[in-house]
Amino acid sequence: MSITEHRRPSLFRSFCITLVLLLSLGLCGCKAQPEADTFFFQYEGYFAAPVSSTLTVAITGFSTKEACAAVFQNAASMSFEGNDAVRIQKFSIEPHESIGAYSACVVRATLAFETAGVTDATALCVQFRDGSEQTYPIGTWTFDVQDAPDHAELLNVWSSPASNRVGNMFPYHYELLDRAASIRSIQYGPDQIADVADGITVYDGVAEGKLALSGDAPVRLIRPRIKVEQNGEAYSVYGICCYCGALDVTEADIQAAQDAASRTA
């Protein structure tokens, strides 16, 4: 028996297997995921909030096909996929200057925190006026909503940085409005809480410093919860949103976001 005769059954089996796979893919409607031509930057987010409150956040979108703002101009509503605890109350679309080959836009979304608890979101659902719907990956966001009202009268949080160049550091600057009160802790992630034992110091009524962030996401969105003690009672104060790493985003970071969106879409 020749070598060629030995190979024939193997080649025939390979042909049959390939044919079955191709037919299966066709019947299932499966196809290779194309590169996303419209996508959002993939953020890692932590948002502390009191129940029955709202917060406006900015989400950056990109398009390689047409003007990014034009893609969403006929959007009727937006929601987080699989998350009913956090509602997008309203939104606006703003054009942004292009970055390299990417047309950019900003979605300013007002989030309404209606239910206490810790929930996640990984995708934004956009419903358009023509009845169509599109889901866009946004990274991994955690919403930490508690039945603890915001005692903003105890702390000035507006002097804290709203953005920086370092994605793995959370900067803070808080000023006590009652010098008899004291800052006890800062929660800046689902399992990340810094207290006085971790080096939080207050000098002349001001707490200032930087807290290290785990992971390697290029940009983090962090809205912290600060615990303040006054007359022996602990109260919650909610900081402003900080876009850690947002001032140093590169075209390579945007390409990575496009690749991630293509994989998870």
Segment roles from a protein language model:
Residues G26-G29:
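C-terminal motif of bacterial Sec signal peptides marking the signal peptidase cleavage site
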Residues A36-E66, P161-D178:
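Contiguous beta-strand segments within globular domains
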Residues E66-Y102:
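Surface-exposed binding patches on compact interaction domains or structured appendages
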